[in-house]
């Protein structure tokens, strides 16, 4: 988190760091907007509007892939604009996985692991995150696209919200700053502390999701930062 690194953790920073500190002071830090439900289910869901015969002919298991349940583009934009108001779409965007389909070692032969990620679920949700009422609503929304019985198949479940990401993983406002640029941004090097991992402060290097190549490419940022340090 470059914000905390430069604005909170540095004590008596050298004059050489003034420019980068001023830059990050002017850079907004957004709040988290992702929540994740993990559940143990006793029966696999069956989608209502999927032609199973089509997948069987091609040897594909539709439950092995990530299912994206997305509202319209206009609604997605609306969901983004609702974040500052602490509101959530009636039909939030959902990402659904059953990891135990791909990894049978995660199941006891009768139960499966079910994962549902909901987007545009703000840290500052106006109803608060102390209740499971809102996450339960996402499960109900998912249940609308599968055959009856899904809710009854849920044996145990938990939800990790942006509030949990802050308290359990120390992410300010439940948000992990992620590098928003791509390879071109790295080549242009307009933010060397993020793309080259070096800072104006001797001995201080950055790594993590905020640095190139960003979240989702596990370990790449740390490896690049380590190479940079060892090359000194």
Residue ranges, per PLM feature:
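A glycine- and small-residue-enriched flexible loop/hinge segment at structural boundaries
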Residues: 118-125
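A glycine-rich dinucleotide-binding beta-alpha-beta segment and adjacent secondary-structure elements
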Residues: 86-99, 148-212
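Flavin-binding catalytic cores
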Residues: 44-45, 60, 73-91, 128-169
